[in-house]
Amino acid sequence: MAINRRTLLKSSALGTLSFAIPTLTLSQIDLGSATISTISDGAITLPGSLSFDSSMPASELEVILEDFDLSKDELTRECNLTLYQSGKKKVLFDAGAGVDFLSGMGTLVESLEAIDLSTDDITDVVFTHAHPDHIWGVLDDFDDLTFQNANYHIGRMEWDYWFDTETVNKVREDRIPMAVGAKRRLEALEGNINLFDSNDEIIDGIKALLTPGHSPGHMSFEVGK
C-alpha cells in the first residue's frame, strides 16, 4: 500500500480510536531472550490545528473525520512507553510525563504495577529526548527521583542543548516553561547519567542512532536479541 498523508492520518486516527479506553499494557513481544512491552502513560488531547495536516484539502479531511467519528477541533492520542527486559535488566525508554504536565497523563507507575513491577525495579532509563511527555516523569510529586535505583542515559547533543544558556532565549515564548522544566529535571540527574553518542552501544544489545528533527539531539534505538 502506498503511504501518503491521507493513509498516514487515517492509520493514526484508527490507532487513537482503538485505544479510546486507556489500557495499561498495550502489547508485548519476545525478542530472543528479551521481552519488549508497550505500556501506557495515559493520553493527551491536542487541538485539531496541531493534529491535522493544514495543507490537506478540507474535503479529504472531512472523509477521515466522518469515517472514524472524530472532531476536527481536537484529537486524543495515547502516550506510550517501551520497556525492555532481558535478564536482570529492566530498561525503560523515557520516563513519561509525570504528575506536573497535563491532565490525563502520568499513568506510568500504575502501568508498571499492572505487570508486577515497581519503579524501584527499573535498572535503566534511556531518553529519546527531553520534551515534557518524555522526561518530566523522572521526578515525583515530592521532587524526588521516581526511579531510585536506575542508571540514566541521554544523548550528548540533547543534554548540551538543554544546558545551553541560550536555549531558553531562542525558543518560542510559549515553550520557555518546557525548556526550564527540561533543564531542572536533567539537573536532578547530574552525577548519575551517562552521555552517549550516535552508534554507541549504551547497554548490551541496545544501540543509539541519532535521529534529529523533533529535537536537536533526538535518539532512536536499535534493539538486538
Residue ranges and their predicted role:
Residues 1-3, 7:
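Secretory targeting signals
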Residues 7-26:
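N-terminal export signals
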Residues 28-115, 220-225:
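Conserved beta-strand hairpin/beta-sheet module of binuclear metal-dependent hydrolase folds
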Residues 93-94, 124-130, 154-155, 210-213:
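Active-site neighborhood of phospho(di)ester-bond hydrolases with catalytic His/Asp-centered motifs
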Residues 97, 132, 217:
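Short, glycine/acidic-enriched loop or turn micro-motifs at the edges of active sites
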Residues 106, 113, 121, 148, ...:
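Metallo-beta-lactamase
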Residues 209-225:
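Active-site-proximal loop/helix segments of hydrolase catalytic cores
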